[in-house]
């Protein structure tokens, strides 16, 4: 897999369609394309942030494995989300788009109600959305940014999960997107890093609450991945992060989506309260 060009920047929240080369959704680093084997046959998935990046790759991969989906997107990301829907429908599965922000509890409940109406039930919940902006010092983070980052990155996980979990049966799975930054403490993403630490703790606590009900709760903590989130956050000289990665390159969305899939399906049936670390070789001490 070739190194990712380091010259691209976008305005927030970034567009999947504008990245060149296009991030890999289903093709692995050895050139092999993901082949479905029914791991999510007839399952119903609610996935937030399915318009681009990791969420897009996971949505298409889940469809290839047999799942119907509801995905969420921001209004300005609708075009990308419609491409995701088209890709899912090509896999012979159904996809519905819920458009809006998830920084308010009412919106999160509306999303879950929409998903239940379209899907009938929820087998897999993937909390995937995130917001981040660079700030070099705590003094540069105003209350508005702190509030938005927390409401998007962890409050939404709580609100969506709270609304959905009573509709999930034994054998269901929840996958939360954390980050390597929860473990290494990136200094220019203090608010974002703080929310990712909260997601790790949320995952562990919730897993202990619902293990007795047969509902598994896990997280994935990606390292630097080639997505619009990165290109719309950092200046171009900081986008190429491969010199920080033992494997010498940024990851591709497919390489995180496969972790989501493992945790969502019965392959990960003995996993709960855990975090997977697709980060290119950075050693993490949990």
Curated annotation (Swiss-Prot):
Keyword Nucleus listed: no
Molecular function as annotated in GO: 3-hydroxyacyl-CoA dehydrogenase activity
InterPro entries to which the protein is assigned, alphabetical: NAD(P)-bd_dom_sf, Sc_DH/Rdtase_CS, SDR_fam
UniProt keyword Cytoplasm present: no
Keywords: NADP, Oxidoreductase
Active-site feature positions: 178 (proton donor), 192 (proton acceptor), 196 (lowers pka of active site tyr)
Coiled coil: none
Recorded GO CC terms: cytosol; nucleus
Family in the record: Belongs to the short-chain dehydrogenases/reductases (SDR) family.
Protein name stated in the entry: Uncharacterized oxidoreductase C4H3.08
């Amino acid at each position: 897999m070739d190194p990712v060009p380091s010259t691209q920047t976008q305005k927030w929240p970034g567009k999947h369609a504008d990245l060149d080369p296009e991030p890999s959704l289903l093709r692995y680093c050895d050139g092999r394309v993901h082949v479905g084997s029914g791991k999510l046959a007839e399952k119903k998935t609610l996935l937030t942030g399915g318009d681009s990046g990791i969420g897009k790759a996971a949505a298409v991969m889940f469809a290839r494995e047999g799942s119907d989906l509801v995905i969420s997107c921001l209004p300005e990301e609708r075009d990308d989300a419609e491409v995701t829907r088209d890709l899912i429908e090509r896999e012979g599965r159904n996809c519905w788009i819920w458009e809006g922000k998830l920084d308010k509890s009412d919106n999160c409940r509306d999303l879950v109600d929409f998903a239940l109406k379209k899907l009938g039930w929820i087998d897999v919940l993937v909390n995937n959305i995130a917001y981040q902006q660079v700030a070099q010092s705590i003094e540069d983070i105003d209350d508005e940014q702190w509030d938005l980052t927390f409401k998007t990155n962890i409050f939404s996980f709580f609100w969506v999960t709270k609304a959905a979990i009573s509709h999930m049966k034994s054998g269901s799975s929840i996958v939360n997107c954390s980050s390597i930054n929860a473990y290494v403490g990136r200094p220019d993403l203090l608010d974002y890093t703080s929310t990712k630490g909260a997601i790790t703790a949320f995952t562990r606590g919730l897993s202990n609450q619902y293990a007795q009900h047969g509902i598994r709760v896990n997280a994935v903590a990606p390292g630097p991945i080639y997505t619009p989130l990165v290109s719309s956050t950092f200046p171009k000289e900081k986008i190429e992060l491969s010199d920080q990665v033992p494997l010498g390159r940024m990851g591709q969305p497919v390489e995180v989506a496969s972790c989501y899939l493992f945790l969502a399906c019965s392959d990960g049936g003995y996993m709960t309260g855990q975090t997977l670390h697709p980060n290119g070789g950075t050693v993490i001490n949990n």
